[in-house]
């Protein structure tokens, strides 16, 4: 049996699977989990794939991209996603996490897929809310948006950031869909003086790119090497990965030269 991942409308990958382990459907989401000989379990969420053996790549990169460029990481907001492994990584800092996800049925269906599901959900500093309005009014050091936000969402979320806060959002991969990345950079650039694209180096099973945005904090100039060296139990993230994430080939430097703000 095979499952297909759509990388772009014109590019697809196929993966061999042995069996379907789970099929859960809610009003807005479809989650299927498969067993694979080469990749362990594979979750397909709305046609996007998550590989259980490689969950740590994105969660470590996004968590420590924010955590190692901020002196303090006290308040974190995660919206528009299901990745509890991201919260697990963020708990390496002395932080409180607000996790906004309305679809409890799908979230709870990841119980055997996310290795630290129970540990995160039971952490006293973790708050799961169905919507932003359910949270106390506060300012955040780091906001992670796990789907590409429109300008209205950007406008609302940036008002929730502290003056030196960091906003990280998912975007299209700059190499595969550079026009979409340009548009995402432009949207964020209307609100932030620092907007820089990045990817996960050596991650070959993803079609994602990301954008680091801030009013004051710079992802390279403000990188704190001692914080990176102090991290324990990480398998992917280090200083080399952090810096390489922002490297662009010559042609993309030219493409994005009017959109990157640093």
From Swiss-Prot:
Predominant cellular place of this UniProt entry's protein: cytoplasm
GO BP annotations, alphabetical order: spermidine biosynthetic process
EC number(s) recorded for this UniProt protein: 2.5.1.16
Active-site residues from the entry: 155
Catalytic reactions on record: S-adenosyl 3-(methylsulfanyl)propylamine + putrescine = S-methyl-5'-thioadenosine + spermidine + H(+)
Record family assignment: Belongs to the spermidine/spermine synthase family.
Subunit structure: Homodimer or homotetramer.
Protein name per Swiss-Prot or TrEMBL: Polyamine aminopropyltransferase
UniProt organism field: Helicobacter pylori (strain J99 / ATCC 700824) (Campylobacter pylori J99)
Gene name of the encoded protein: speE
């Amino acid at each position: 049996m095979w499952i297909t991942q759509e990388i772009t409308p014109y590019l697809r990958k196929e993966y061999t699977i042995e069996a379907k382990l789970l099929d859960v459907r809610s009003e807005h989401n479809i989650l299927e989990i498969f067993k694979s000989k080469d990749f362990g379990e594979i979750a397909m969420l709305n046609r996007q794939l998550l590989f259980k053996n490689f969950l740590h790549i994105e969660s470590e990169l996004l968590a420590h991209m924010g955590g190692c460029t901020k002196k303090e990481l006290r308040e974190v907001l995660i919206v528009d996603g299901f990745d509890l492994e991201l919260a697990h990584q963020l708990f390496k800092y002395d932080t409180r996490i607000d996790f906004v996800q309305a679809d409890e049925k799908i979230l709870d269906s990841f119980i055997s897929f996310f290795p630290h599901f129970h540990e995160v959900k039971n952490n006293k500093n973790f708050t799961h809310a169905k919507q932003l309005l359910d949270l106390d009014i506060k300012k955040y050091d780091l906001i992670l948006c796990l789907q590409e936000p429109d300008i209205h969402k950007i406008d609302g979320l940036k008002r929730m950031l502290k003056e030196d806060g960091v906003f990280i959002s998912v975007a299209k991969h700059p190499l595969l869909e550079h026009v979409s990345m340009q548009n995402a950079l432009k949207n964020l650039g209307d609100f932030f003086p620092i907007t820089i694209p990045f990817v996960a180096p050596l991650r070959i099973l993803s079609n994602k790119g990301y954008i680091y945005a801030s009013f004051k904090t710079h992802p390279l100039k403000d990188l704190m090497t001692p914080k990176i060296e102090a991290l324990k139990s990480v398998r992917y993230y280090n200083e080399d990965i952090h810096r390489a994430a922002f490297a662009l080939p010559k042609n993309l430097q030219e493409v994005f030269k009017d959109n990157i703000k640093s």
